[in-house]
Design a protein with these regions (language model features):
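Active-site-adjacent loop and "lid" segments of alpha/beta metabolic enzymes
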Residues: 1-14, 18, 23, 33-150
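Active-site pre-Tyr helix/loop in NAD(P)-dependent dehydrogenases
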Residues: 30
């Protein structure tokens, strides 16, 4: 996370030094690029630090492999082993198939709603309508919660 934040801050400094107005800078942490394991999730968990750089933030997590990995792990954990009848041989492979990119749209919409709730300026997605719905529902709930707290 620190490496990505430092890299974005350095890039921002070069842009400003080259004459780009700070209000024209949008930061994208590059989810899925040169990252592995939990790094994308760690970057998402550190959105506050990214916001602290003082610019709009764009998240492009739609259909990315890190979503598939989370979904595939959950699918595997939910899979119930099927045991063959006595003497019928070995237990067949019970791993569910990996999620195809288009089967990650619900997860992409959920991620978009979550990061929008954290103040992200924009999201890049493949399937816009369900994402708009997810963000709208999350924003409506946030508004009601805020209203009830005042």
């Amino acid at each position: 996370v620190t490496e990505v934040l430092d890299e974005l801050a350095a890039l921002r400094d070069r842009l400003v030094a080259a004459g780009v107005h700070a209000e024209n800078i949008i930061l994208d942490p590059g989810l899925g690029f040169a990252k592995g394991g939990m790094q994308d999730w760690e970057l998402l968990a550190a959105l506050g630090q990214l916001h602290a750089l003082g610019h709009r933030v764009l998240i492009a997590g739609s259909r990315k492999r890190f979503l598939a990995n989370a979904l595939n792990a959950a699918d595997a954990a939910r899979a119930k082993p099927q045991y063959p009848a006595a003497g019928a041989g070995t237990v067949p492979d019970q791993m569910p198939p990996a999620r195809a990119p288009e089967d990650r749209d619900a997860a992409s919409a959920a991620l978009s709603a979550l990061v929008a709730a954290q103040g992200v300026w924009g999201v890049r997605v493949h399937n816009v309508p369900p994402t708009v719905d997810a963000v709208t529902v999350a924003n409506t709930l946030r508004t009601v919660i805020r209203t009830n707290q005042t």
